[in-house]
Regions:
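Extreme N-terminal, non-catalytic leader segments
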Residues: 1-14
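NTP-dependent small-molecule kinase module
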Residues: 5, 149-241
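Hydrophobic anchor at the beta1->P-loop junction of P-loop NTPases
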Residues: 17
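P-loop (Walker A) phosphate-binding loop of NTP-binding proteins
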Residues: 20
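Conserved lysine of the Walker
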Residues: 25
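Hydrophobic positions on the alpha1 helix immediately C-terminal to the Walker A/P-loop
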Residues: 28
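A glycine- and Lys/Arg-enriched "phosphate-lid" helix/loop adjacent to the NTP-binding pocket
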Residues: 106-174
Length: 241
């Protein structure tokens, strides 16, 4: 992972955590929002889900195996792209109005990766990218990288949903081949929750030191200090990538 570098940087406003299902991004995003707030940098967690999970539940109630069987591949990708666009737009607007750091659990890159992993065409990806181009690139994007086999084990252990190993492998490749990949801060998410949280904290310390001290804290406080409370175990992801 590239180390955080101090310098003339604006105040941290948007951080995104992305990765395949089972990488732990929901756990880390929730924890990061809490950690930043405790450290005097008020932050809000935003779950930018594409709706695939609850659509899957609706499909099951209607006698279909999953959302794709209900809507078709193209229909599912359209609905997912629209719902995630709306979620991201709402999160960005909320951050702009509140002045709080927006911690994004999934962002535009997740939709691009989902399109590729589900076999979407280049033309469809181009249309989605055109729609998502409205959104600014997060100041920091953490890609939580984990072996697809380990991600599969985690998903099976939590027992709230299911993903095939083949899909997870395709999604992992999709993230790594996105043109945005060189801008990601890649984190080894195969380690414990605590180790991953500490590495994320270490990278952001440079940003927070360069961007100004904690909000509402005395000027004598250590500007880059962030206290890391012990995070809980893996929280079941709320939606697929």
């Amino acid at each position: 992972m590239r180390a955080g570098v101090t310098g003339n940087r604006p105040r941290l406003r948007t951080v995104a955590l992305i990765g395949i299902d089972g990488s732990g991004k929901t756990t880390q995003a929730r924890h990061l929002a809490q950690m930043l707030t405790v450290a005097g940098h008020p932050a809000t967690y935003h779950r930018n889900a594409g709706g695939r999970r609850w659509l899957g539940r609706a499909a099951y109630r209607l006698g279909r195996p999953d959302a794709q069987a209900l809507l078709g591949r193209t229909g599912m990708l359209v609905v997912e792209s629209v719902l995630r666009w709306l979620a991201i737009a709402s999160a960005l607007l909320g951050g702009l109005l509140s002045g709080r750091v927006a911690v994004m659990d999934r962002y535009a890159a997740c939709q691009y990766a989902s399109l590729r992993a589900h076999g979407g065409t280049q033309r469809w990806e181009g249309l989605v990218r055109a729609a998502y181009r409205l959104f600014p690139r997060p100041q920091v994007t953490f890609l939580l990288a984990v072996d697809p086999t380990e991600a599969y084990r985690r998903i099976e252990r939590r027992g709230t949903d299911h993903e095939s190993l083949g899909y997870l492998t395709a999604a992992d490749l999709a993230y790594r081949t996105l043109p945005e990949y060189p801008t990601f801060v890649v984190i080894d998410a195969g380690r414990s929750v605590q180790e991953v949280a500490r590495e994320i904290q270490g990278y952001l310390a440079g940003w927070l030191a360069a961007g100004g001290g904690p909000v509402g804290r005395p000027s004598g406080c250590d500007r880059s200090r962030m206290v890391v409370p012990a995070p809980p175990g893996l929280i079941p992801a709320q939606a697929r990538p």
